[in-house]
Amino acid sequence: MDDNILGSQVFQIAGTKEHIIIKFVNGDLAGTYIIISPEDLEIKLKLWKANDKPLCNIPGKAFEVYKIDFVYQVANIGAYERDQIKHLEEGKYALVLNGNNIDKLFTGSPKTRGKPLMKESLKIEIPTAVLSVDTGDAQTPSNPPSVKRFINVWLKDRADNLYDPKVKPIEKDQVFTLNFDIDLISRSESIVSDTVLNYNFLPGEDVVAVTVRLETDDFDVFDEREKKLFLPLSGPSKNRVSFSIAPKHDGDSTVTVVFLKDGNFIQLITLKFDVGGNVPYSRNELGRDLSVVEFIQPRDINLTILNSIDGYQLILSGAVGAMATLAIKLPELKEMIREARQALMGIVNYNENNRFIFQDQVSIPEAVNQKVLPSLAEAGYRLYQRIFFSPSSDPNVQNLGKKLRQILQSEPCKIQVFSQDFVLPWGILYLADRLDRANIQPSLFLGLRHIIEHIPLQKDMLVIENKINCASGLNISLNVNKDIDKTMGPLVSSQEKYWEAIRLNNPNVKVIYRTTKNEVLSALEDPKASDQVLYFYCHGISQDVEETGGVDASTLILSGNDKLTIKDLSIDAPIVDRLLNEPLVFINACESAELSPLVFDGFVPYFVAKGARGVIGTECKVPAKFAVEWARRFFDRFLKGEALGEIFLALRQELYNDEHNLLGLLYALYVDCDTRIFPSIISD
């Protein structure tokens, strides 16, 4: 339906053949959602037009009777809200939003109470009579174009004079003011240059708050470490923020500054000084261009983890902020992760009466669950303790660990992790204050309570719209090892049948089948390849840097033992030829050799650099039957338009609560957790 029917009053209109949902952005019902039938809307418009009044001036009170009773955000739906929806009174409506997008509509009708009537993807057809109404000069609000703006950073001394550290090194105990703003130009006094900050403003959004968080171990900071810049729709920021700092010591000294919007990482600036020395000042920037994203969903917690000389610098942002340096070197990190993943493998290989229970079935007896649950909780608890409460942990590290655990023990959160090579099996972290093996609480596993996305931190990070456009249909490729069926039963063929059924019921779905290395390489070397989802169901081997062949030897094994390595991909399908369709890559590596703790070093960076929007991967080998079941349940929800993070959390909880199966924790998201298809392919 055209958004200009009610002129500047309307922000969004969507619906079904029976219902139209409208949001008003100004006037009597500003911010209100109404639900109305096409017939009633047509009558209202005709009556208003009959009085020779412009449609853009139609009063909101004319629609007050159609006001929706309950409006929720997906991220805030809890037990109370679900109960309200389930017991809606007849004639009442409940609307669920995902940001500014309409997600589901519920009605109190006895026939459909508690069931969603529509998805945001369903669009209505406008009756001819409505289309013929003259809309006059009404203007439709729309997303204004993104304006290119720059972060400026400059130093001033105590006398308020500009200070250029590239000309004169700073001195120990000397107090400076470190200043930040956002401007239309990169000014000459800025000690960083051409550092762009882009953001896509929403309709009706005039000013946004950008959080500036400063962290350092090398400088005294005489201010709050977190401040806000207010960025208007156009022009420079409304304000500047300043931090008074003084070097604690001579030599290498670093200041790290993180920029966030609603908990979402935007930009990282690292300023490096040689205090009292002669080494030139330097800086490094890593950032994301958010102007391509229609709506940025808030994140409750952001963890930015940076490589440092002493280990890893961890910056916590959110309701509580903190910074600490983890005295952990890469070899120790690998060993920690290896031990944690051994616990996962202990579940995969659990043997009782000569039966590998988790490999033979998806539904696990409760008695078996109670035997494996304490060992996984111990591994997750031990991993958290080694990170934050080891003998080498200083008070800052321990304090950050306590704060983070306290936050994560409360309400469910969306967690965003940015790191360079600090890659954990985040889902298995067990967040109890003390480990009580006789009373393990599954909700204290991070992955059974929270949504977690892990995004690689790199220069010029590509940000892709989190909606996969399926207006013309969906193209998915199944890249499989058919030999799996010869030894394990019809696991590949069952997935082919699943997709054939989807295709037959949805002519706009195109399924591409590939079984060999050359077929996959041929597709990946073509920038115009049609794949929107690249799904792999095959064996996989992930090599560490120090192992024979290194990362280049990481392998996906297709039919006929056809081995596709990272080396093959880099030579025959190089990253310079980016995939224009920006596919989502799902590597469902089953019954494979144990994956390296740094699988991140192989397939994830290759596909992201190649243009993929992100990767779904596994922490270690997954039983073949479970991999098929996870994929089926995943695509059932994904094709309905649900977001990846919501799918992961729901499936993990569903499989554990209903089947006593913990293996959902084996899967990880290296992609924006709000990624979804739009419009949906199938309905509820």
Model-identified regions with their sequence ranges:
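Short, hydrophobic beta-strand segments
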Residues: A79, S237-H249
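Short, aromatic- and glycine-rich surface loops/edge beta-strands on solvent-exposed regions
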Residues: K92-L97, S253-K261
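Short acidic/polar inter-strand loop motif in beta-rich domains
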Residues: I102, L260-L268
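Acidic, serine/threonine- and proline-rich intrinsically disordered appendage/tail regions
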Residues: M118, L122-N161, L271-A324
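Contiguous beta-strand segments within globular domains
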Residues: F150-F201
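A domain-level signal for caspase-like cysteine endopeptidase catalytic cores
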Residues: L306-P395, N399, Q406-S410, F418-F422, ...
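Cysteine protease catalytic core and zymogen-processing segment of caspase-like enzymes
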Residues: R437, I541-R613, W630
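Caspase-like cysteine protease fold
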Residues: S443-C470, S559-L580, K625, E629-D684
